[in-house]
Amino acid sequence: MKNLDDLLSEGVRGRRVLVRADLNVPLDGDRITDDGRVRASLPTIEKLTGAGARVVVTAHLGRPKGEPDPKFSLAPVAARLGELLGADVALAGDVVGESAKSAVAAQADGSVVLLENVRFDARETSKDDAERGALADELAALVGDGAAFVSDGFGVVHRKQASVYDIAKRVPGYAGGLVLSEVEVLRTLTGDPRRPYAVVLGGSKVSDKLGVIQALLPKVDKLLIGGGMAYTFLAAQGHSVGKSLLQQDQVESTCKLLEEHGDKLVLPVDVVVADRFAADAESRVVDADAIPADWMGLDIGPRSVELFAGILAGSRTVFWNGPAGVFEFPAFAEGTRGIAQAIVDSGSFSVVGGGDSAAAVRSLGLPEDGFSHISTGGGASLEYLEGKELPGVSVLEEGR
């Protein structure tokens, strides 16, 4: 798989380089609440502009319905990217239309153009190969002959989409530094990780993570379960979970996992329950098998944090994906904070699997450099660990 260094050694001055970045940041109105993904895109863009490339960035934001929608505009991202780069970033008013063509034609060496949200074009996410291919053809024409494509949006490499997969069949493709480092870290986890190897999985739904749980259990020493999905596991043990999140249709498969891998699966022993789903709800700590009928579990309890921390302290490799509770509410953030701190304190090779876990690290004020690696792609990380092919990576490995 060719990478950014290979491209730079070829020389990029005056060449157009299309960079697929992951700039899918959370917004409050037009204010970016977590710019982690924008920051993660900087090294690749800066190396290219520093070498004189004419950088054209394509990315998505949210899930627009295949047509322009002002609330999903990349305008706030263009502004923030410009601030971080210390240079103007021109935002094209469309994806491959006249505005994009004009912006790209006007580029000087070392400049950056950000195309408008690629998902404003319905062909980006089409299941029809020909439709996606048509958009990829237009993207290739936009950057012209002699151009290169750098895939640096790890958060989307598990998607077979025009700007991720099909474009690499039309323009010579290279893995950006971000994608390369992410794949190397995941290969470490799936290859020969230092043991003991512990995985912490949180989040709301068992159904979202059943595949990765089944794939990981034969490979890990301990798998710790937190978050909303813990209540389906507790129900599978025969406990009443009150009004906690429960996927009744997953209880049977969860029960089977407990029967086959009960020695590896570790569940909460106590939980923080609330009388309603709200930041100011009344709350108390109860044993995991004593959740009141009208209450809901919104976090793991202090004894669970202590139990999990003890396991993590003795681990040499840790992968964490998904918060332990509703960390956005301060009263229910201590489980997530405790797990994160225990991972940092363990001194292990530690990987935070993107998504809400990465957001939690930042919002709770934990030191990012306390972890070996914070992934920018939650879904992509999980699919890789599950053994699924990542189309955006495999197409680079095949080469054009």
From Swiss-Prot:
GO terms for molecular function: ADP binding; ATP binding; phosphoglycerate kinase activity. The keyword Oxidoreductase does not apply. One of its GO terms (biological process) is gluconeogenesis. GO terms for cellular component: cytosol. Substrate binds at D22, L23, N24, R37, H60, L61, G62, R63, R119, R159. Gene3D superfamilies: Phosphoglycerate kinase, N-terminal domain (3.40.50.1260). ATP binds at K209, G297, E328, G354, G355, D356, S357. It is found in: Cytoplasm. Keywords: ATP-binding, Cytoplasm, Glycolysis, Kinase, Nucleotide-binding, Transferase. Coiled coil: none annotated. It comes from the Bacteria. Its main location: cytoplasm. Disulfide bonds: none annotated. Pathway: Carbohydrate degradation; glycolysis; pyruvate from D-glyceraldehyde 3-phosphate: step 2/5. Its EC number is 2.7.2.3. It catalyses: (2R)-3-phosphoglycerate + ATP = (2R)-3-phospho-glyceroyl phosphate + ADP. Monomer. HAMAP family: Phosphoglyc_kinase (MF_00145). Belongs to the phosphoglycerate kinase family. This is Phosphoglycerate kinase. The lineage of its organism: Bacteria, Bacillati, Actinomycetota, Actinomycetes, Pseudonocardiales.
